[in-house]
């Protein structure tokens, strides 16, 4: 999968209709909590994977320890692609510190970790696609998706990138 992902590393653009749908959906958020929850739901729906979003770091340095997750049920739909029991993956998802560590090095470039490239042993049957959001050179938060190693990488990378761009505009 790594060769494929590296070969197709350029993120395919989303259609104008998809971009409008994202913008309209996120425009309906009235506060930060709604924006984060709607963004996670949107990302999970677009990719059919588990979406994780950290809250932005505020001026006081807080926020990055808070996150929202959506689409955990999508793991059950791709159970055969994961090759193992879902229990270790679900355990890792419940550990907020694990997720914060996985998203902690996200920057303004989409990053893909596949299978054994994961630092967390419970997630070695999965792939993680992450990116930071906020100002281009200094992201204030991160978002990503977690799913089986057999996923639509090009589509997932495009969705992660697009949602990050829109969330960054609203922050």
Segments the model singles out, each with a brief description of its role:
Residues 2, 6-171:
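Intrinsically disordered, acidic Ser/Thr/Pro-rich low-complexity regulatory segments
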């Amino acid at each position: 999968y790594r060769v494929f992902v590296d070969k197709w590393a350029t993120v395919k653009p989303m259609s104008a209709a998809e971009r409008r749908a994202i913008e309209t959906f996120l425009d309906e958020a009235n506060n930060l909590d709604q924006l984060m929850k709607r963004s996670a739901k949107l990302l999970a729906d677009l990719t059919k994977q588990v979406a994780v979003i950290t809250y932005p770091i505020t001026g006081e340095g807080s926020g990055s320890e808070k996150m929202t997750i959506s689409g955990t049920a999508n793991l059950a739909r791709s159970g055969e692609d994961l090759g193992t029991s879902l229990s270790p993956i679900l355990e890792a998802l419940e550990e907020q510190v694990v997720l914060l560590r996985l998203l902690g090095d996200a920057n303004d470039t989409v990053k893909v970790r596949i299978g054994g490239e994961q630092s967390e042993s419970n997630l070695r049957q999965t792939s993680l696609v992450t990116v930071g959001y906020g100002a281009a050179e200094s992201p204030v938060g991160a978002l990503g998706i977690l799913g089986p190693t057999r996923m639509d990488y090009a589509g997932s990378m495009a969705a992660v990138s697009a949602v990050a761009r829109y969330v960054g505009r609203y922050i």
